[in-house]
C-alpha cells in the first residue's frame, strides 16, 4: 500500500510534538503493511506545486495529517488548502483520508470539501461533534503522540518544575519570566533558533520582519534547555514533578509520561477537549498565569490514583484505536473508487 502524506509537520522548526506525531504515524502505516512514498510539508501550498507532485499512478492512498490546521477556515487559507485534497483524490481516483485532526470553528465550505474524503478521524469528541453538525461522521482517536508506549513510569524519581512556551508569544514571555522568578527551567517546544534569512531573502521586507520578530522573541524568552531530539524533550518532561505549559503537545507528552501539569489554553480549545475525553475535566486549566509556583502549588497538583487510572485507561484505548484506524484506512487503499 503506497501512501502519500500531506501536512507533514516534522519540518515545523524542530517542533518536538510534531516530530513524534510523524514518527508514530509512519510507524503505524508500516506496522500495518503500508509504505510512505511521498511526504508534502505543512508550509507549502500543494496546489501551486504541480510539478512537485508524485506520479499518482504510483500512489494508493492520500493521507492528510490534520493536527491543529483545520480551524477557523473562513479566515485561514491553510485549512481550505488541506480540505481541497478531497477533490484531488477524486480526480485521480485515489482514496483520501483525514487523520489526527482537530476541527474547530470551521465554515460550511470546509465541510463540503471534507465530504469528498473517504473517511475522517479526529483527535477528540468535540471535533467529532462539530463534524456531525455539518452532516459528517468522524472516528475519534487521540493524538498520534500517544499511539505508542513510552518507557517511563509514574514511580520514577522526579524533581523540579519545567515550563514550556505557548503558541501565543505574549504568554510565552510571561511563562519564561515566571520560570526565572521560580528558579525553574524553561524549554520551548521547538529545537531551532531563528536564523538570518540570507542575503537573497533580505530583499523581501516581509522575510526580514518575520526574522526580526522571531529573533526578538528568542531574546525575550530564550530557552534554558533546547534539545536536539524529541526523545530528549520527553525525558526532560518525564523528569519533572510539575510542568506548566501553553502547548497542546506538551500536555500529550505529560499524559504519555504521567507527569503532573497545569496548562493555559492554546489557539483553540483543543487541550481542554483532550482532557475532557481523558476524564480529567477542566481541573488543570489555568485562566491566569500564577504569581508564584511554590511547594504548596506543586504538591496540590500531583496526580491522584484516580487520575492515574483514567490516564492509563485512556492511553490503552488510544493505542488500540490508533491501530484500528491504521488498519481501516490502509484497507481503503486496496480498492480505488
Regions found by a protein language model. Give the residues of each.
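Active-site anion-handling motifs in enzyme catalytic cores
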Residues: 1-337
